[in-house]
Amino acid sequence: MRLDKSKEVFDNTKRYIPGGVNSPVRAFKNLSITPPVISKGKGCRIFDIDGNEYIDFVLSWGAMILGHCDPDVVNRMKEVVEDQIAFGAPTEIEYKMAKLVCETAQIDMVRFVNSGTEATMTAVRLAKGYTGKKKIVKFAGCYHGHHDIFLKEAGSAVAELRLKRIDEDIVQNTIVVEYNNLDSVEKAFKENKDEIAAVIIEPVAGNMGVVPAKKEFLQVLREICNLHGSLLIFDEVITGFRLSLKGARALYNVEPDLVTFGKIIGGGLPCGAVGGKKEIMECLAPQGNVFQAGTMSGNPIVMSAGYATIKKLKENPHFYSNLEMLAGKLEKELTQVFSNSNLTFCINRVGSMLTIFFGVEKVENFEMAKMSDLDLFRSFAEYMIKNHIYVPSSQFEAMFLSVAHSENDVEKFVEIAEEFCSSKRK
C-alpha cells in the first residue's frame, strides 16, 4: 500500500498544526506508517488521497452509526444550509431536536453544546452547583474529555502517549477509583464524607478499550450516590444512541441523574449534550444560576444532521438487532482465528463496540487493560490498516460497526486477521 501523497500532505501539515493533527490519536504516533489522509467516505468505506480504499471500523470514533454520508442526513443538511448556517439565536430545529432527544432517550430536559468535552464539563459544573459540593469521583481509564479535571488517570490517547501535562491544583478535587471495584468507591465516600458532588462513569468504557461495567456494580453505585446525596452521571458520549435508543442505560436498567451525549447525536458534526432530571437541569442559566454558554451551541446545520440521524434510528429499530448480529459474528469468528493461532487474548464486546486485547484472558478495569500486549496490538493494527481494514491505532480505543456494514465486510476483517496470525507464525 502506497501513501506517498498522504505522507507529503501530512509532513507539510506539521508546519502549521502541532503534530500534523487536530487530535493526538490521529497521528499514528505508535505505528510506523503514515496516517492515510482521507478524502472521501461512503457507507462503511473511506478513501485516501492516494486512492486506497478501506473498510472503516473506526467510523469517526463511533459517530457514524449510519455509515458515512448517509443520504437522508446529507439531504437534510442540504435543505438547511441554503437558509441557515449560524445565528447565535433560537431556531425551530433546536426545539424539534430537543423534543426528539428527550422522548427517544427518555430524559426530562437537554442542553446542547459543541462537543463531548463540553457536555461532561457542563454536567460536572451542574452537579457541583446543584449539590453545593466540590469533589467528583471518576474511574481510572475512563476518558471524559480533555479538561484537566478529567485527565487524572484517563484512558484514550492520554494513556497511549503517556501524557501527564495537567494542572494539579485543578485536579485536587478529582478522586480516582477503580472501575468495577465497589470497595474503592466506598472508601472514597468514607474518606470524603459529604464532599462528593457526583460520580461520573462510562457505563460501558470505550477509552481503555471496551470494558463494560458489571450490572451489580452500577446498581450499587446508584445506591451509594442516593445514600450520600451525590449525583450519578453517565457519560454516554460514545454509547448514547449506539447501544440502543436509550443507550447503555437500557442494558443496565440503572437511571443516572444526568447523562452526557456526543458522537452520534450530531450526525457526524461537532455536537454534545447534557440531559437529565428537570429539577437539576433547571439550575442552568438563564433559568438557574449555573452558567454555561456557547455561540455555536444548537447550530442549525448540526441540529438538522443530528435530527435526521436519530429520527432514522428511531424509525428503524431493527438496525440495533442487525448490528448485534454482525458484531456477534465478528467476535465469534475472531475468537476462532486467535484460538487456532494459540494466542492468549480476550475480546470485549457490547453491542456494536468491541476491542481485542492480546496477552491477557480478561480485562475488567484499566490496570488489566494496561497489562495487555501493546506491541502485538500495534503490529495487528498496522497490518490491518496496510491491508485496507481501518482500525484504531491505539489499544485504548474501541472498534465500531455501522448499519452500512455487511457480512462480507466482517468476513474480510476476519480474513485479514487470519493472515496477520499466519504472518506471526512464520
Curated annotation (Swiss-Prot):
Compartments, as annotated in UniProt: Cytoplasm
GO biological process: protoporphyrinogen IX biosynthetic process
Class of this enzyme: isomerase
EC number: 5.4.3.8
Pathway annotation: Porphyrin-containing compound metabolism; protoporphyrin-IX biosynthesis; 5-aminolevulinate from L-glutamyl-tRNA(Glu): step 2/2
Keywords per UniProt: Cytoplasm, Isomerase, Porphyrin biosynthesis, Pyridoxal phosphate
Matches recorded under PANTHER family: GLUTAMATE-1-SEMIALDEHYDE 2,1-AMINOMUTASE, GLUTAMATE-1-SEMIALDEHYDE 2,1-AMINOMUTASE 1, CHLOROPLASTIC-RELATED
Protein family membership: Belongs to the class-III pyridoxal-phosphate-dependent aminotransferase family. HemL subfamily.
Protein name: Glutamate-1-semialdehyde 2,1-aminomutase
UniProt organism field: Caldicellulosiruptor bescii (strain ATCC BAA-1888 / DSM 6725 / KCTC 15123 / Z-1320) (Anaerocellum thermophilum)
